[in-house]
Amino acid sequence: SAYAMKYAKGKKKVLSVHGVFSEQVDALHSKSVSSLAKSSESQVLQWPDKLTTDSKATQKLYKEKFDIDFEYLPTPLDTDMFENLDSVKKIENQIAYVGRDSHEKGIDILKAAESEINGNVVYCTNRSWKDAMKIIKSSSIVVVPSRMESLPTTVKEAFYLNVPVVGTDVGGI
C-alpha cells in the first residue's frame, strides 16, 4: 500500500503500519524479495506525511531502527457489536485459535503442540465474527501463537469477553 500511496493524489498522506514491514516480508517471501524490502524500507517510510501504528512495540522498533517517529493509535474495539452475542456455556478445556491459517500467525506451531495439550483446540480460521466470538466466549483460553504481530484484535476481543489469552512474546502481545 505504501507504493500506491506514493502516487496517490491527496493533501496529506498517512501510512498505518501493523508490524515491521521487512520482518513480515522476510518471513513470508523469498530472499530476493526480502532483500528488496529491507533495502527500500527506510526510503518508503519517508513518503507519507504521517506514520501511524497500533503497536507500541512497532513504534519503538522503528524509532530504534531508523530514528523514525510513528504516532501510536490503538485500534478501537467496537463493544456495541458484543451486545447481541448469545450467552453460551463454558466448555471445559476448550482452547480457541482465532485467525488466518497462515505461517506468520503460527497456526502450525499450535497444531504441532496439540497432542501435548490437555484440551480440545477449536480453530476459527474461516468463521463469521459472531461464530468466532461465541467460540471464544465458551472457551477456557485463547491461544495466539503468532511469529509476528502488532496488537491483535483477537486479544482485545478475548479480554473483553473475560477469556484469558496465552500468546507468544512478539509485537504487542
Language-model features: where?
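Active-site proximal beta-strand in glycosyltransferases
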Residues: 8-26, 52
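Membrane-proximal helix-turn-helix segments that form the acceptor-binding/catalytic region
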Residues: 32-51
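Conserved donor-binding/catalytic core segment of Leloir-type glycosyltransferases
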Residues: 52, 88-105, 111-114
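Carbohydrate-associated surface elements
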Residues: 57, 76
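Short alpha-helical segment that forms part of, or immediately flanks, the ligand-binding pocket
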Residues: 133, 152-160, 171
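Short alpha-helical donor nucleotide-sugar binding micro-motif in glycosyltransferases
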Residues: 134-139
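Aromatic "clamp/platform" in nucleotide-sugar-dependent glycosyltransferases that forms part
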Residues: 147
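Short hydrophobic beta-strand element within catalytic cores of glycosyltransferases
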Residues: 164-167
